[in-house]
């Protein structure tokens, strides 16, 4: 029975990674994610999960490392752009924040929160 449960977890590695993060086991999640990275280096979901984890851990460099890779795959991914916007906002890198806002609005013109950020920065 234990073997079957463990096999189930590892046959869905992204699900296992999310579970580790959800349970707050970040050290194990980083280790597990690093082991998966070669196989999932072009997997949008995996990269976003890793980037989100580093955002939770307040590591802007690693967050951007993964989120920029997501955006290489899908340039107008609103969730990835939003996360990138937040990191650059925290770093006070307003030119990049403006760029992210404009891309988000081009995909979702009803995003009033992003419009407000853009209006505030562009004055």
What are these language model-derived features?
Residues 35-38, 68-72, 103-106:
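Conserved structural position within tetratricopeptide repeats
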């Amino acid at each position: 029975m234990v073997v079957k449960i463990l096999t189930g977890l590892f046959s869905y590695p992204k699900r296992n990674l999310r579970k580790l993060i959800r349970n707050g086991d970040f050290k194990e999640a980083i280790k597990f994610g690093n082991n998966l990275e070669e196989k999932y280096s072009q997997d949008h979901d995996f990269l976003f999960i890793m980037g989100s984890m580093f955002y939770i851990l307040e590591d802007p460099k690693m967050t951007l490392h993964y989120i920029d890779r997501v955006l290489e795959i899908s340039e107008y991914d609103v969730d990835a752009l939003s996360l990138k916007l937040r990191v650059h906002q925290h770093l006070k890198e307003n030119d990049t924040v403006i760029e992210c806002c404009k891309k988000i609005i081009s995909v979702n013109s009803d995003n009033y929160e992003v419009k407000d950020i853009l209006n505030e920065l562009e004055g």
